[in-house]
Amino acid sequence: MNVSRTRKKLYPPVEARRSGNLTVSDLHEIYWEEAGNASGLPVIALHGGPGGGSSPEMRRFFDPRRYRIVLADQRGCGRSTPFSELRENDTWKLIEDMESIREHLGIEKWVVFGGSWGSTLALAYAVTHPDRVIGLVLRGVFLLRRSEIRWFYQEGANHLYPDAFERYVAPIPEDERHDLVSAFYRRLTSDDRTERLKAARAWAQWEGETLSIQGPRVRPPRFEEDDFVDAFARIECHYFVNGGFFEEDGWLLKQAAGKLNGIPGTIVHGRYDVVTPLTSAWELKKVWPDADLKIIADAGHSSLEPGIVDELIRACDSLADRYA
């Protein structure tokens, strides 16, 4: 990282110029929106979680004069319906939805941008639809391996944030703490809304308190909203107990070896990312020679930390220079 250069900042806020709801099954409707230049370089920005939903800030990583910016709320979250729904909700359905949106909007190929779980989904899409990907921009790489889930939700990150971890495990009795993800899942799928929300708040707060090393750790406002934390925690936990719905542990990294050849990409990762440690980005780079790995010395996991913002925008600008 060149610390002497001026860091790029988010582009000014831009409003969606059109939006809609796409029926993707008898059960699910997906909210989508477009911003920026209708004739620009298409990009789909994938939100995290899963279950996090899109936000207006996600549009601001792209030059609206040069990009056709597509956002969508994945199944069960944001403005998609039914809300917090776990049925028909898995990685492969989300990839099908991406293809449905692409076809609905008449896009042949697009840049795929995603952070955290968004990087997981972006990679899964790229290895199954490489002919539809112009380039990848990934942040906070998460390969959804058991070791990554155990690090953050069971044993690892607790040594760095023992205070926050104590609050996280509070809803779970001592005799169930040997498998916290399963214990949370039982509560997050309970019919008792009070019990479900108590668990959801603890789950979301844990992630919210460990996102950033920049200044005081202030949770994003939506981490205080009951509807948000309900969907966020339920859907995340649903994917984690099911191993991301991949065939085997480590499937994504194995598929990336070879199948990403020829796809240009940038991986941006905070040196002190506690949520998704740097190991996964490092291992991904080893099997993806066309990728450029940017390690940010003064950043954690959040997409809004200054060093992360700078490199993400530089990566997106570079793709626009090349393809727009």
What annotation goes with each model-predicted range?
Residues A291-A324:
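Catalytic active-site module of serine/aspartate enzymes centered on a nucleophile-bearing elbow/loop
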Residues K8-I30, E236:
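N-terminal cap/lid segment of alpha/beta-hydrolase-fold proteins
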Residues D131-F184:
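A catalytic-pocket lid/entrance helix-loop region that shapes and gates access to the active site
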Residues V24-P82:
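Conserved HGGG/HGGXW glycine-rich cap/lid loop of the alpha/beta-hydrolase fold
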Residues V274-S280:
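Conserved alpha/beta-hydrolase "acid-adjacent" motif
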Residues E108-S147:
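Conserved hydrolase catalytic core segment
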Residues L260-N261, I267-H269:
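Short beta-strand/loop motif that positions the catalytic acidic residue
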Residues W92-W110:
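Conserved acidic catalytic loop of the alpha/beta-hydrolase fold
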